[in-house]
Amino acid sequence: MFDQASMNNAQQGARAFRLILNAMARPGKVFTLPSLIERSGPAYATTLTVLLALGDHLTSIYLAKAFSTAEIEKLLRFHTASQLLEDRAQADFAILNAADAEMALDAWKRGNPEYPDQSATLLIQTTSLTLGQEVQFSGPGIQSPITVRIADINPSFWKARAAANATFPLGVDMIFITPQEILGCPRSTHVSFAGDI
């Protein structure tokens, strides 16, 4: 029997997947991400949508303490079948608040020379992608340096990120997320402070 609802859900999931890939291919550009699911506790609907689009039974997820609730864990297990890990060093994805993102950036999975893609993607929730301290993004996918203003991110975070990604192509990818929008920051993106380029 034809199931229109299932087809619509699949189409919406495919659109979300393409939009997320586009955000990673065009670092620093803000994209509006239609939600596939309602917000759950502290986890934005957009954050959960990213995990629903990218996660599956072969992936693993680390939840920072604020997000490690029974409701969120149940939701992720049901919709993604991903394994939920307490060891961040083994996780493929992680949900973090911006305030917690700087902690032990070098502790995440960064891939290896043969399989650099076997690394972590950090989903970092913030309050705004336009009202933070100004930094410049440059690198692959960016035609000319682009100004980015992610709220709740300290300069020390960008320095820790540079150190964690110093042995490219090994490194950690990031997606910054608000209740409606996402901004990609792959490991290949160079981040500098205004005037440093």
Residue ranges and their predicted role:
Residues E71-H190, D196-I197:
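Internal, well-folded beta-alpha domain core
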Residues M1-S60, A64-F67, F78, P179-E181, ...:
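N-terminal, charge-rich interaction modules
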